[in-house]
């Protein structure tokens, strides 16, 4: 006659059957450990960037941290692209990024969004290079300014009637000349071109 197994062995056998094999559990534990370690690392970075310790990284604090790390200041178009990405993560009514937003921003920059941010920065750099090249066409002597005489010469080569009247050329310079020095520097040229688009 067969005897039924003792109740404790039935429970042990059913618990063992319900438990996933070690080959599944171990990678899950490792992944959870990596996530915790990454969160702790990000928390340390967040606290390092949050200079005043208020739990929010302002754009100024982020910019300062990136400067200290040597990742800011060399490519203004890339910096502008980064500023736009960061601004998208700042919650309405907040002065900066809280840890959860910082973590989400990090995830985007590390994943597909990071490649998109890089592509956007590269496109912005290309646009900047094109703008500098256009400025160079007008800045014939390369001194960093477009004078009325330089503008008149370029307009004349282009066959535009405005070149015939120096007063009209000076008016064109004055319209773009924000600091009233009688010539157009690169930033003024850029602002004029942006206003025209």
Swiss-Prot record:
Give me the stretches of Low complexity compositional bias.
9-30
**InterPro entries in UniProt:** EF-hand-dom_pair, EF_Hand_1_Ca_BS, EF_hand_dom, EF_hand_pair_protein_CML-like
Organism superkingdom: Eukaryota
Positions contributing to Ca(2+) 3 binding: 177, 179, 181, 183, 188
Q: Which CDD domains match?
A: EFh
A molecular function annotated in GO for this UniProt entry is:
calcium ion binding
Q: Entry's Pfam families?
A: EF-hand_6 (PF13405), EF-hand_7 (PF13499)
KW Hydrolase (keyword) present = no
The record's keywords, sorted A to Z, are: Calcium, Metal-binding, Repeat
Record domain EF-hand: where = 37-72, 126-161, 164-197
Q: Which sites bind Ca(2+) 1?
A: 50, 52, 54, 61
Entry binding sites for Ca(2+) 2: 139, 141, 143, 145, 150
Q: Where is region (Disordered) located? A: 1-33
So what does this one do? Potential calcium sensor.
The protein's name in its UniProt record = Probable calcium-binding protein CML21
Q: Which organism is it from?
A: Oryza sativa subsp. japonica
Gene name, Swiss-Prot/TrEMBL:
CML21
């Amino acid at each position: 006659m067969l005897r039924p197994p003792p109740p404790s062995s039935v429970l042990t056998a059913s618990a063992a059957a319900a438990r996933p094999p070690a080959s599944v559990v171990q990678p899950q534990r490792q992944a959870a450990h990596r996530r915790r370690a990454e969160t702790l690392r990000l928390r340390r970075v967040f606290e390092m960037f949050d200079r005043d310790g208020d739990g929010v990284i302002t754009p100024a604090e982020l910019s300062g941290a990136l400067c200290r790390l040597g990742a800011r200041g060399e490519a203004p178009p890339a910096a502008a692209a980064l500023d736009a990405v960061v601004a998208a993560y700042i919650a309405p009514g907040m002065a900066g990024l809280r840890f959860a937003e910082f973590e989400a921003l990090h995830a985007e920059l590390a994943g597909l969004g990071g490649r998109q941010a890089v592509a956007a920065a590269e496109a912005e750099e290309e646009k900047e290079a094109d703008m500098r090249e256009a400025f160079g066409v007008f800045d014939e002597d390369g001194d960093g300014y477009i004078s009325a005489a330089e503008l008149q010469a370029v307009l004349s080569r282009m066959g535009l009637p405005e070149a015939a009247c120096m007063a009209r050329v000076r008016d064109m310079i004055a319209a773009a000349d924000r600091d009233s020095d009688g010539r157009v520097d690169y930033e003024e040229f850029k602002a004029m071109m942006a206003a025209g688009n």
